[in-house]
Design a protein with these regions (language model features):
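Conserved beta-sheet core of the metallophosphoesterase superfamily
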Residues: 244-317
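A general structural motif
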Residues: 34, 71-72, 116, 183-185, ...
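Bacterial Sec-dependent N-terminal signal peptides
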Residues: 1-22
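Extended active-site neighborhood of metal-dependent phosphoesterases/phosphodiesterases
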Residues: 87-201, 210-211, 283-308
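N-terminal active-site segment of His-dependent metallophosphoesterases
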Residues: 20-97
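Active-site neighborhood of phospho(di)ester-bond hydrolases with catalytic His/Asp-centered motifs
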Residues: 39-41, 73-80, 115-124, 190, ...
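Active-site-proximal segments of metal-dependent phosphoesterases and phosphodiesterases across multiple
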Residues: 32, 92-99, 197-200, 209-265
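Active-site environment of divalent metal-dependent phosphoester hydrolases
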Residues: 46-48, 83-86, 123-132, 170-173, ...
């Protein structure tokens, strides 16, 4: 026994002092000077079943592990963080978690990258109301505060606009990034079906003297239909919240904001899968997370990413 213990002690000591091995799974950009951002589609499929929640932990752990390798500057999430915002009665045909359990699970997954890389969110219809965006109530600002991420996000946060409950929230917020080889970038997040006030705030921000020369990325949960619906811009959502005057669906966002502001160069949305279209000569395409958009420029790309409804698409980012 003493010999065995001595052998194990020696082995552990050798392991402790041995140089780190080169990992076979390290991903690096082809250009060492390149920068990246991670786009996460709607994660509700990960959190509505407890058995799927560890998959989303793997997603955020992979991000944390590759921040330096890929020079990741931010993580952008298109919302629908939970399946239902505020419900305790379980419909076991579609979930086995209460709303509180889902909010705590998705918050826990993102806590893995708190203080490591900023994560920005545009909440979706599932993040509001009782079950189906019946009203403007959301638990998002209770779980996703600026303080939880600390300086890693506060140094980028340059403006915000109150949500529909009148609360300070990162639902409507603007973040400034400086990447090597790029103009300065302004990323604007939005609440689901943003209010007229939030839309006007974003417009004023984009054309202001301070940000008029920035490349603007606007992220909103809902903007386009899927390819089965001809990739059209959503004319009007059918949720009670979106029926209220002053809340804007896709066509209203195009008319009031995207078509009016030239430095909005990229719009990111979730909600539907496989969207792609050309609008007034502006490129609007990306079929799946792994799609390659050919013969297109960066100008006015509209990406629509949606993870598999049942299990979150196995952890792809």
């Amino acid at each position: 026994m003493k010999k065995l213990l001595s052998f194990l002690s020696a082995a552990l000591c050798l392991y402790a002092v041995a140089p780190a091995q080169h990992r076979a799974d390290v991903v690096r950009p082809s250009d060492p000077a390149a920068s990246s951002m991670i786009l996460l589609g709607d994660p509700q499929g990960y959190v509505k079943y407890d058995i799927n929640q560890p998959i989303f932990d793997l997603v955020t752990r992979w991000i944390a592990d590759n921040v330096e390798n890929l020079n990741i500057n931010a993580v952008l999430c298109t919302g629908d963080l939970v399946e239902q915002n505020d419900n305790n009665a379980l419909n076991r045909d579609m979930l086995n978690q209460t709303s509180r359990q889902m909010w705590e699970a998705v918050s826990s997954s993102f806590s893995i990258i708190d203080g490591v890389v900023p994560h920005l969110h545009s909440p979706g219809n599932h993040d509001y109301g009782f079950k189906h965006a019946e009203d403007e109530h959301t638990f998002f600002p209770d779980y996703f505060t600026a303080e939880r991420q600390g300086e890693v996000i506060l140094k980028h946060l340059v403006a915000e606009y109150p949500n529909r409950e009148g609360r300070a929230s990162l639902e409507n917020a603007a973040f400034e990034f400086s990447l090597d080889g790029w103009k300065k970038i302004l990323i604007i997040t939005s609440e689901f079906a943003p209010s007229d006030g939030a839309v006007e705030w974003a417009k004023s921000l984009c054309i202001s003297e301070k940000f008029k020369d920035h490349i603007v990325i606007y992220m909103t949960h809902s903007y386009m239909r899927c390819h089965k619906c001809d990739n059209s811009i959503i004319p009007q959502e059918r949720y009670p919240l979106t029926q209220k005057e002053g809340n804007n669906s896709g066509e209203q966002l195009w008319a009031k904001l995207f078509s009016k502001v030239p430095n909005i160069r990229l719009v990111i949305c979730g909600h539907h899968a496989h969207a792609g279209e050309i609008i007034d000569g502006k490129m609007v395409v990306c079929d799946t997370l792994s799609s390659i958009c050919e013969n297109k420029t960066l100008e006015d790309r509209f990406f629509d990413i949606y993870l598999d409804y049942t299990n979150g698409n196995g952890g792809e980012v």
